[in-house]
Amino acid sequence: MLLPRRGLRTLPSLCLYILVLVWVVACEPEGTPTPLPAPEESRWSLVPSSVKELVGPLLTRTRERWQWFWGPGALQGFVQTYYDDHLRDLGPRAQAWLTSSRDRLLNTAQGLCPRLLCGDKDQD
C-alpha cells in the first residue's frame, strides 16, 4: 500500500487509532450480555394477545370453509379441465407448427439466395 505524501505524518495517529481499537475489543467482557429488564405492563403490551384472540377464530373459520378448495378433488378437476382445453391436441399442433415454420424458413432462405448460388427454383 502506497501512502500519500501526508501519509508519513498521519501514520502515528493511524497506529494510535488501531491500538485503541484493539484495546477496546480486548477489554470487552466475554460471554453473553445481560438481558434487558422486562418492560412494565402497559396497554400496548396487551395488543398482540388481543389481536391474536380476535383474528385466531376468523382464520380458523376461513381455513375450514376453504378446505374443499385445497382437497384433491378440486385440484384434480382443474387439471383435467386444463388438459382437455389446452393440452389434448398439443402434439399434432406442435408438429403442424414445426412443419409450417420449417417451410417458411426454407422459402425465405431461398428467396434471399442469389440464383447463381442456389440455382433456379423451377429445376427442383
Curated annotation (Swiss-Prot):
InterPro entries: APOC4. Blood plasma, associated primarily with VLDL and HDL. Expressed mainly in the liver. Glycosylated; contains sialic acid. Present in up to five sialylated isoforms. Residues 1-27 form the signal peptide. One of its GO terms (biological process) is lipid transport. One of its GO terms (cellular component) is high-density lipoprotein particle. Pfam families: APOC4. It comes from the Eukaryota. The keyword Glycoprotein applies. Keywords: Glycoprotein, HDL, Lipid transport, Secreted, Signal, Transport, VLDL. It is found in: Secreted. May participate in lipoprotein metabolism. Belongs to the apolipoprotein C4 family. This is Apolipoprotein C-IV. It comes from Oryctolagus cuniculus.
